[in-house]
Amino acid sequence: MTPSPTTVRISDDALALACGADGVAAAFAAAGCTVERVSSWGMHWLEPLVEIDGLGFGPATPADVTAILDGTSSKSIGRIADHPFIAGQQRLTFARAGRTRPTSLADYIATAGWAGLTRARAMTAAEVLAEVTASGLRGRGGAGFPAGIKWQTVANAPGTRKYVVCNADEGDSGTFADRMLMEGDPFQLIEGMAIAAHAVGAGQGYIYVRSEYPHAIAKLNAAIALAAEHIAPFRIEVRIGAGAYVCGEETSLLNSIEGKRGEVRAKPPLPALEGLFGCPTVVNNVLTLAAIPHILSEGGAAFYASLGVERSKGTMPIQLAGNIKHGGLYETAFGITLDDLVNRIGGGTASGRPVKAVQVGGPLGAYIPPAQFHLPFDYEAYTVADALIGHGGVTVFDDSADMGAMARFAFAFCAAESCGKCTPCRIGSTRGVELIDRIRSGGKGAPDAVESLPQMHNARKAGRTRADDLQLLEDLAETMKFGSLCALGGFTPYPVMSALKHWPEDFGE
């Protein structure tokens, strides 16, 4: 009797594809194997990762196929589920990661898919809202606003037309959880949006995806078509962004969906009251909405609320990136420390050099030194430390990093990405670049814009000292933090001032 072909599971996640997964899959198919393309386990340093009967091999190349099949490969990592990186996690949002085919409805249903929506539709909208509120779920996009309160506001708002909008404009450096979820488990996001629609009375949903995610866009469109009868009468459409970082801000995003320039709106009114096309709108990010199906499953809200610490409830998919040995996605309850994340789980730097800084929360997050790695990963602790959790991105830098240059980059990034509507962000970021350059050069460069301004007759004639420039930088940071219309200008001071505080030696003498 002819033996059945070996079934090989290989991710079709964008990162795996970039690492050569298609070539590895083709080599296994040529060797007579049945190849299944599944979602990513999130162990990015091992991609392309090959799974055969639960055993993992990686990073694999086409040349490794023969050794893997005959059992002599040196790239075996044992059972994937038992690997310390996976076994130590508390996966709820990413419970299906590595285990299912992304656009297989059969796989989704076999892993409790649609259970949350089925239960939600057997409940009243008020009961669903109470369940989400009781779970303690907060927005995973950075603001950390309680999801239940936002939904309740939309539900209570007058009007017959309401919308659910998913912010999938994942523009922060070092973040990839949204992309992984959309590419690996799109039905879960769709289910979460359908539950939100039932709770607030919305009939239409939009997923706003950045144009740099073509694989995610294709997976979402395929999944939406397959899920149409499951979520009806609710409808979902994908809208593609044009690359503006500021469109990750909810009101800029709404303008973009409406076909307008991606520009921040003044608040009030809040989008929950006057959002898309002037109608009450729920705007949540991918991870927030993807957490909903579990919460609405039987007993899910109570269990979800039991995880985490104080007001930071549930789990957070943390993304380990930058100069780190074991980069990838690690989902765990709030409260874990940076030391655990970077050193125990991440394995330290990929370069082998000492860790100098970690930036948490994307390009607008504060730089945290090793002396503060004891901080628990939760919203309140980071707020007290003048830092941000943001979208859960953790980017590692070794001791070769120039923190003065990183501070300058924060201002330059803000200047390049500003929508231009408010003065503190538009002008402050440009002045910030000039000021950092002046401080780092010891005031020896050409006169900056401030010095070039017309001077009052009674202005002091002495040039600005380093102390003057540092005070001016602090004043500028305060103005941007409290005067900007959105977080782009408002959060730029976090990386700048944290770099100056902890590494003054990188700013010159």
Label for each model-derived stretch:
Residues C19-G23, L46-E51, A143-W151, T175-D178, ...:
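Short acidic, glycine/serine/threonine-rich loops at helix termini
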Residues T2-T7, A21-R37, L46, D53-G71, ...:
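Ferredoxin-type iron-sulfur electron-transfer modules in oxidoreductases and energy-metabolism complexes
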Residues L105-A115, C166-D178, P271-L276, Q319-I324:
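Gly-rich Lys/Arg/Thr-decorated short loops/hinges at beta-loop-alpha junctions or inter-strand turns
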Residues T118-P158, A305, R311, Q319, ...:
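Accessory "access/gating" subregions that flank catalytic or transport cores
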Residues S74-A134, F277, T281-G299, L307:
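Flexible inter-domain linker/hinge segments
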Residues T111, Y213, I217-F334, G346:
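Hydrophobic alpha-helical positions that pack around
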Residues D185-A199:
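Histidine-anchored nucleotide/phosphate-binding helix
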Residues G192-A194, A333-A350:
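Short amphipathic, charge-patterned alpha-helical segments
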